[in-house]
Amino acid sequence: MKRFSILLPLVILIASCDGVLSSTSSLVTTSSEIISLSSSTVSGSTSQLSPIVTIDLYNLNDFHGAVEHNPSNKEIGINRLAGYFKTQLASNPNSIFLSSGDMWQGSADSNITRGRLVVDAMNQMGFSAMAIGNHEFDWTDDYLFLNQTRSDFPLLGINIMTQATNQRAAFADASIMIERSGIQIGIIGTIGASLESTILTSAVAPYDFVPYTNLVKDESQRLKNLGADLIVLLNHDGTVESGVMPYVDAVFNGHTHRREVFHVNGKPVYQGQAYGQAISHVRFAFNTANMVPSFIQNQSGVYTYESLSSSNQFPQEDEEMKALYDTYLVNEINEVKNEVIGEAEEALTRQQLGQFAVDEMLRFAQTVKEDVVASFHNSGGVRATIDQGQVTYGELYKAFPFDNELMIVEVTGTQLLWWLSAGLYQKTVPNLTPVDENQSYWIISINFLTERHLESSSYPHDLDTAINTYQYIREQLKTRWLSEGTIRASDYN
């Protein structure tokens, strides 16, 4: 099979919707230092006059259903995102659009449709592959299977294993091979081997996330045997297993919502923040006239980025995407999302919303069981702030997107002391302390936390006496807001 040398393997870019790229890497330089190739030798396709083919890889990570344009949080939204991708594809037909996971869960727009809207949008934008992230499991594997069937692209997760069979999960592919102008690009997907702990225990119980270095090594070799000229890893984790780097040419990370620009042994490892706030972009150039399968390192050491401001790089909404989104809004979303639930006298921070949540949890718990003495909620379950003024259910949904059920559980005094020292949002009844270690107490928390005790000693409680209220904190806060009308942030400092 014909093989090509990579003439400029690493011209690496990251796009930022706020026009600023923060990086401590000394290898990140300004766009004026981009290596210049004449138009007679660089092309998006192979021709006699243009032996150099450029492949542009664009990756979106941790989108979390941020389909609505939200300039205050630098969220570009799907209409403008589609416009940007369409422009890039017109500029270079060899552009490839990818995702390193956590695409569906996180907004009313996406959650109401269980990710269906985001999948349809990705189909319309022409995504080629997506790694499975931990939050793709939030609605159990039922929706992984449903969204896999709906997707025009594969969901990748080479190290997601079904416990019962020790085989890769049926909804997860190991890789995909993509061809552009005679260049074969192998795409492999992984998820961090420790990320089961970030998922509701019952939702991920049938699966294990195993270490993936050897799996990637073998899959990379298989793809190269099939003719791959380039191997790209989509990795849903903030770090990549070090043993993987000899077997891939570029890595797109996710999960930690950081903006990262660095390299390992000359190979790019990128992450583009979250919510569409940044887009990672890596460019490779191939010399199709060279038949020798060699990897030519870029001796100049020039790495570059371009800042893509939402004001001047995303000026137009894509009309086709707007039509898709508007249809969803009218038919399924607006009636729920736009319900006004009250007022915020001041803006509420995530910390204040967390305290508001445990305040309401304790009040609600005592209507179910009057001797509940404390409430607990994790900080990671509060995902956004709420602005001053009129508050809609959609805003509350974005702050509390997870469908975690409120659980009332019995604990010993010793176990209660563990909860009190766990660093959670918490509220207790007056005069709870000193805690009697030999006495029994009742507390309320969310099942994301209580289910952790099924597999570990953390979040201890009596499993046999637990009471599931089948209520979500989001719904309880909505009811509270509707009842009180106005919520004051200062009440929850």
Features from the language model and the residues they span:
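Bacterial Sec-dependent N-terminal signal peptides
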Residues: S16-Q48
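Positively charged n-region of N-terminal signal peptides that target proteins for export
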Residues: M1-F4, D18
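Acidic, metal/ion-coordinating pockets
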Residues: L37, G44-E306, Q352-R363, V372-H377, ...
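Bacterial N-terminal signal peptides
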Residues: L7-S16
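Catalytic centers of hydrolytic enzymes
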Residues: V53-D56, L60, G65-P71, A82-Y84, ...
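Glycine-centered small-residue hotspots that permit tight backbone geometry or close packing
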Residues: D18-G19, G101, G189, N431
